[in-house]
Amino acid sequence: VAGEMAQPFDTEQLLKMMFGAPPHPPMRCAQPAGDEVLALDRVSSPGGRSGLVDCSITVRRGEVVGLAGLEGSGQEVFLRVAAGLKPLQAGSVRLSGQALSENDYHAFNRRGVYFVPSARLEEGLIPELTITEHAALLQERRTLRVPYPAAAEDAGRRIESFRIKGRPRTPVEELSGGNQQRLLLSFLPPDPALLLLENPTRGLDLESVNWVWRHLHSYCRRGTAIVFSSPELDEILMVADRVLVFFNGRIILDVAAAETDVQNLGSAIAGKV
């Protein structure tokens, strides 16, 4: 029992009792939107419960865009289409004004697009490999010889810089969810054009959630566009500049986060706009 309260209830005090801290005010990046980074023009693609249907949207440098909707409503397909991981049935994708509609993550990646999946161990990291071994996979080399000493030093730097609670020889499955996410974020380059993230704070404690968003907002201040999905509407409103609501594979609401609230987003998620 963390506390007790009699009516009338104070919402802020209840949240403090439940989570150990009062609710956080908006921590949006609020960067002026720059040039076009990503543009989808009438894109349709299969997947999930409803796929993605006739989607047209533009994302600009420095924007943080949150994707809301029931699971399977199109958010995951949208992110994977934007990353070059899913084929198109119709439409086209532009990156910084250049058409790039082939289903090829490496081609998108060469243009500064990076995708961080929700399934950290299933898609993001390799179970049974250590932090050092992950660092070794990232290093450029001209021979088949694995540069373990250099990789161990690199792993140590990542652990220190990202405050990961682990050691270079720690297998990644032994890390907590928050530390797995910190490790994944440590693999990103310093200046991506576009970051696409599925549920980046899934299962994390409040301290880790705040750390993740402080880190991600440091990218948008350098001009990176960020698009992320989350089932938590409060989180989306706290950190995003703009919200896209998906319903049955379509974007049915595109609104500035400062101009909406949980009730309006909830209605849109139910298809009521």
In which residue ranges do the predicted regions lie?
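Glycine-rich phosphate-binding loops of nucleotide-dependent enzymes
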Residues: 1-273
